[in-house]
């Protein structure tokens, strides 16, 4: 969160870095910042994830090195933190090795997401990628078969042959 109306060379430099890292920015009135924190905020409040993000290439390699078939969940435009947490909780029960999310148009991993996940977000690595298409191409190149969920499908997931390395796409 950045206070509306902040200007200057340092602000320009900060905004350049923010855009380079694909960080979501919201400009808000100073009153909102004052309400959120009681200490000096200098016009900026950063919300950081309670979990660290991982690199997808490293994770897939680690799963293969353990002698397991990767099972990767890809979430496309899941924006509600509680839905994200509930999906992570279910994914952990089904043995998902990692969750892949886009750096834009995705729920942030907040305390609410972690709480709803019942701690699953501390167990399942999350990968944040700039392009889901590139991530899918990478996963296919690693031998994963890709499945996509749709409410319009006539085939139920339990009827699919899902042995071997796989990625499952879910979204809104």
Would you name each region that the model predicts?
Residues 147-172:
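Active-site/ligand-binding-proximal alpha/beta "capping" segment
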Residues 76-86, 131:
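Amphipathic alpha-helical repeat scaffolds
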Residues 36-49, 117-120, 163-171:
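Short basic, glycine-rich beta-strand/loop surfaces that mediate nucleic-acid
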Residues 97-155:
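Histidine/lysine/aspartate-rich catalytic loop segments that bind and position anionic ligands
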Residues 57-65, 138-140, 158-162:
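Short amphipathic alpha-helix with an adjacent loop that forms part of the alpha/beta core around
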Residues 1-64:
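N-terminal positively charged helical leader segments and presequences
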């Amino acid at each position: 969160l950045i206070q509306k109306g902040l200007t200057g060379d340092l602000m320009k430099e900060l905004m350049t870095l923010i855009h380079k890292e694909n960080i979501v920015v919201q400009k808000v009135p100073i009153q909102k910042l004052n309400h959120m924190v009681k200490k000096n905020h200098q016009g900026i409040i950063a919300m950081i994830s309670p979990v660290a993000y991982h690199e997808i290439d490293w994770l897939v390699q680690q799963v293969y090195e353990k002698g397991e078939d990767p099972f990767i969940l890809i979430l496309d435009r899941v924006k509600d933190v509680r839905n994200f947490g509930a999906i992570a909780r279910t994914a952990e029960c089904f043995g998902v090795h990692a969750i892949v999310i886009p750096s834009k148009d995705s729920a942030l991993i907040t305390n609410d997401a972690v709480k709803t996940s019942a701690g699953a977000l501390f167990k399942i690595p999350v990968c944040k990628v700039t392009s889901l298409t590139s991530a899918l191409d990478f996963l296919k190149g690693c031998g994963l078969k890709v499945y996509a969920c749709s409410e319009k499908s006539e085939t139920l997931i339990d009827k699919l042959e899902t042995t071997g390395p796989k990625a499952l796409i879910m979204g809104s």
